[in-house]
Design a protein with these regions (language model features):
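Glycine-rich active-site loop/strand segments that organize a redox cofactor
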Residues: 38-91
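A structural signal for short, well-ordered beta-strand segments and their strand-loop junctions
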Residues: 32-35, 106-108
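N-terminal Rossmann-like FAD-binding beta1-loop-alpha1 element of flavoenzymes
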Residues: 4-33
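Flexible, glycine-rich phosphate/dinucleotide-binding loops
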Residues: 17, 40, 52, 115, ...
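Feature captures the FAD/FMN-dependent oxidoreductase FAD-binding
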Residues: 75-133
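Short, glycine/charged-enriched secondary-structure capping and boundary segments
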Residues: 24, 46-49, 121-123
Length: 133
């Protein structure tokens, strides 16, 4: 049986949005990652602050593997090193967003106005047996 996987829309290209898109794409899901500004803009706003946890706790094994597959010479931070928010963005989040798994599905400078579910033409067409999302 070859069922088509549902398309996943992720709102926000911050750390969680990028990692979520990465895992979904790795599993074969079609993904669109929307960001109203720049990648990890909120982290960049407090980029001067040192993170409370080391890099190893702020990255995933899939993220590290994706970066190494993309560029074997990419210098990853020491897993025990603590960095500023800005360093986290420039050394991990931006390169990850530029990787083959994310780059094609990322849409920056796009503000999401509304979301919904397929098959709902109007409020009266809601089938109570269907899950809401």
């Amino acid at each position: 049986m070859n069922e088509e996987l549902p398309k996943i829309a992720i709102i926000g290209a911050g750390p969680m949005g990028i990692e979520t898109a990465l895992y979904a794409r790795f599993l074969g899901y079609p993904v669109v990652l929307f960001e109203k500004g720049e990648i990890a803009a909120h982290v960049q706003a407090w980029g001067h602050v040192q993170l409370f946890t080391p890099f190893g706790m702020n990255s995933s094994s899939l993220g590290i593997s994706a970066l190494q597959a993309q560029d074997p010479n990419h210098a990853l931070p020491d897993p025990n090193a603590q960095h500023s928010g800005r360093d986290w963005v420039t050394k991990y989040l931006e390169p990850l967003a530029s990787s083959d798994l994310i780059r094609g599905c990322l849409r920056t400078h796009v503000q999401v106005q509304a979301i919904g579910k397929d098959r709902f033409a109007s409020p009266t067409s809601i089938d109570a047996s269907m899950p809401p999302f």
